């Protein structure tokens, strides 16, 4: 039961980035049993831990959550309306470019919302999970299939670390996008070349998996998720 519960939490977190305000560490799975002459009856419930609230730090009440959701809904609706008449590829490209230009990478990794869509679309400062969840959130809104992928990435310096990115489906094939790595941090007054901003945009397995290694392992106590099979070649 505990494993199934963890798997459900992991899957829910990947599929519903809009539920960013729930802190799963404040939730506990309670199992009650009652035995009589007819057998044993089990009741399962999810309850708040000693903290007494499911909400993440920074959101103290339902009013705070509703306000945040309204702000996100306005941003999502505005972007969706701008790309409403575009073909699927153009929708993906415009939303990708918007995120690259709009968000700054949180090098400190200390911000409360650094791993969610509120941190990305409202506060504009996140790490890789925030980028990946925002792409899924916006592509879901415009009808383009998109999943969040977890694993490790090896950068140009040869450093390997935990990472998150996306797979997107176009023309019935899946392609990889790493919005985070398309938005490198620039030190000084230099500008990012246009080619750098699309280096990890709609890539196939042959190129992308040289640096990205999907694990499907969201948490230590969960199962390994099976991801869609990438196209061998980049999108053309």
Question: Which residues make up each language-model segment?
Answer:
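Hydrophobic/aromatic-rich core segments of domains that either
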Residues: 130-207
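Secondary-structure boundary elements
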Residues: 61-120
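Conserved active-site-adjacent core of cysteine acyl-enzyme catalytic domains
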Residues: 112-126, 130-137
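Low-complexity, Gly/Ser/Thr/Pro-rich intrinsically disordered linker/tail segments
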Residues: 191-236
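Alpha-helix capping and helix-loop boundary segments enriched in small/acidic/polar residues
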Residues: 1, 63, 122-126, 150, ...
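Non-catalytic propeptide/linker segments at domain boundaries
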Residues: 31-69, 75-79
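Intrinsically disordered, low-complexity N-terminal segments that are enriched in acidic
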Residues: 1-49
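Short, well-ordered strand-loop elements centered on a beta-strand within folded domains, enriched
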Residues: 42-48, 118-119, 123-125, 173-179
């Amino acid at each position: 039961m505990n494993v199934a519960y963890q798997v459900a939490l992991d899957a829910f977190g990947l599929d519903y980035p809009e539920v960013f305000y729930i802190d799963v560490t404040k939730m506990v799975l309670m199992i009650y049993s009652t035995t009589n002459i007819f057998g044993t009856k089990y009741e399962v419930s999810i309850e708040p831990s000693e903290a007494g609230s499911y909400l993440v730090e920074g959101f103290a009440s339902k009013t705070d959550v509703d306000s945040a959701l309204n702000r996100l809904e306005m941003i999502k609706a505005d972007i969706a309306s701008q790309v409403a008449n575009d073909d699927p590829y153009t929708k993906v490209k415009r939303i990708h470019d918007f995120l690259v230009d709009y968000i700054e990478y949180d090098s400190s990794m200390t911000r409360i919302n650094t791993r969610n869509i509120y941190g990305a679309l409202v506060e504009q400062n996140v790490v890789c999970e925030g980028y990946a969840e925002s792409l899924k959130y916006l592509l879901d809104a415009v009808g383009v299939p998109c999943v969040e992928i977890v694993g490790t990435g090896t950068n140009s310096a040869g450093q390997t670390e935990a990472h998150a990115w996306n797979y997107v489906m176009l023309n019935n094939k899946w392609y990889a996008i790493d919005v985070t790595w398309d938005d490198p941090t620039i030190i000084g007054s230099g500008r990012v070349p246009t080619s750098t901003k699309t280096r990890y945009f709609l890539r196939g397995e042959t190129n992308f998996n040289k640096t990205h290694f999907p694990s499907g392992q969201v948490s230590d106590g969960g199962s390994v998720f099976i991801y869609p099979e990438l196209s061998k070649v980049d999108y053309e």
